Amino acid sequence: MTEIMVSTDRLVKAEIFRQQLYSIAKDMGTIMIRTSGEPIISEAVDFSTFIADKNGEIITFSGYMTMHTGPAQAAIRYILQNYSEEEILPGDAFICNDPHTTAACHPPDVGIVKPIFYQNQLIAWSWAEGHVLDVGGMAPGGFTVGAHDAYSEALRFPGIKIVRKGKLVKDIVHLIKVNWRLPERNINEIRSFIAACNASENQIVDLINKYGVDEFHEYVELNKLLSEEAFRKRISQLPRKTYEGTEWAEHNGHVNDLFQIHCKLTVGEGHLTFDFNGTVAQTDGFINVSKGTAIGCALTPVMLALTQDIPFNEGILRAIEFILPEGTVVSAEMPAPTSMGHAETGMRISKLLTELISQAMMESDEEKTRSYAMACFHDAWPAGIFYGSDSEGKMFILADSNGGGAGGGAQTNQDGMDAAGCFTQLSNGLPDIEINELTFPVLYLWRQLNVNSGGPGKYRGGQGIDFAWIPWGVPGGHETVNTACWQVPPRGIMGGYPGGTSGYWVIKNSNVHQFMEEGKVPMYSELAGKKELLPAKHIGFPIHPDDVFVQFEGGGGGLGDPLKRDPEIVLQDWQDGYITKKMAKEAYGVVIDENGRIVEQGTQVLRINIKSNRLHKGLKPKKECLVNSNELTHIKSSGESLVIKEDIKGLRYVCCSGCEYPLADENSDWKEGAKVLKTEAPKALGKFGMWVKNREEAPFVFVDEYICPGCGSMLHIGTSIGEN
């Protein structure tokens, strides 16, 4: 790409325009928070806002939900393709929630798309989308565990007018009222989205009145060009190479299978290609995603790893190609159901690309670029929908947004964030417990960090959360659950371990009310009753007044060999209640005595023994690299666990960063030069006190540990599936 030559004055003005447009998009979000009346918007921040140019190219977005980038672009373009210029009029607004036409992440994500006119000329579009509590279909709350097709899931709107010339279309409003279970609340949410779009139009018109329509178009396009140029330069810091990996979506709502998602990342000259050939065909369960949703989820690690300091707009997309085979779980066609797709397959896409991009960044010659590599977020949204009727016969639906409390992936300089939420939804918040209790018929017993859930590493994965509630003021109800990351844990990086996984318990016929009558709130260990583990996906599980519903969320992946973690930090983690003594000892090799002090000599001996045990149990390397490390010269690091060294002929080799043991030449798979220890995931992580759901039949999930044959350091930990 030819470098853009722009005067300083124009650059300054372009930035002023960019900031003003970004501020308008953020103001749209503020309006939604203040007017929707729903905790899922005001507390959980489950929405996004965008502004696009007249052709549907993204100008700016508010940053709330990064995975909405694909659906926003697709929705506007679908409307442009299906309506003539004469049919799109000032004052109009379109409603869209159909994954198969307007690429909604799932039907409960309802978008309002508004054309913006200046002097009767179409100049831009605004888009406001948020999660609506119910959209009809077979399951209250919109997560249709038992659906076999899209027809069962929801009343879907493919970008049709809900506002015509400034007035609500009564027929559409009436259609919503008779099909959605909470019509008054649903309509109020949609009105708040419309209000946000109306406000954006007023502010953009004011901006054009100030600067003129020609300057508006000029600086909108210039900002796209500047972002494109900056991004292509960033890509040029990565090796020209292809990286390949696989992830697995779990349990499609009907069968507990594993569904392969495969991606090949090719780094070209200022260009990235993500090729998803090798991904399985779409399924009749609700874990499929639309092409637009797949793109939105794929863009998340791109934005947060490679463009964290580059304004996001259409310019970024010009440097990326997505190859998404139609009829697969990553580009589903009618009639595939999709209501859990974004939170299962979509987040697997995000995790897989986080790993592939981090691999490329670790091999960069630029130290700053290498420093942005990271482990995977837990990236699951363990959804819980509690529904029923209150004492007056009115229906309630609690879409518990505490699902956004899973742990973040470790970074190259710090632990992962606790209760970070999902990588694709970083602006999500955890709802205020009191607000939930005021709005819905539940009483929370606790909400706390989930001990031992973060993946062990030199830098620990962030912890997830653990919470419990009981029905309150109602004669019970039913619970629909659906979580990803139940059996396949989120991978660590550079020798860090995967994080723990997520799930649900119900304690049936508990003694909770005995404590309540005494004015006490019981903790988990005090509760008696029958403890029942729920499936990852289940619809309509009965919850009675004496039952306690418990949800626990896993952590992010760790980074670096946990034996490299400072024992004092391990001790602090134990004192803070983040980990148990078992985790400290088995994962980190730190011995803590009965007085809460580190046993220094015992710790040193234990760490030596752990490395020796790795070497003893690990399988012999597939290939041996027959070079003398002493004859090699250090060139650069390649992440926490590896270094690149060079011989006198200029040939480069991948070596262990600890002992500099040569593993392979730079163009070969260095893992073939490492010892390998393959263990079923529940056993591999369970020895640390972590939780991973075991699979009762093949394929089984394994943790694959790659160990330096020279010193026993942990170089890399992957996951795989197999028969035995």
Question: Residues of each region from the PLM?
Answer:
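Glycine/proline-enriched, intrinsically flexible loops and inter-domain linkers
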Residues: 2-90, 95-118, 122-620
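Acidic, low-complexity intrinsically disordered segments
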Residues: 715-716
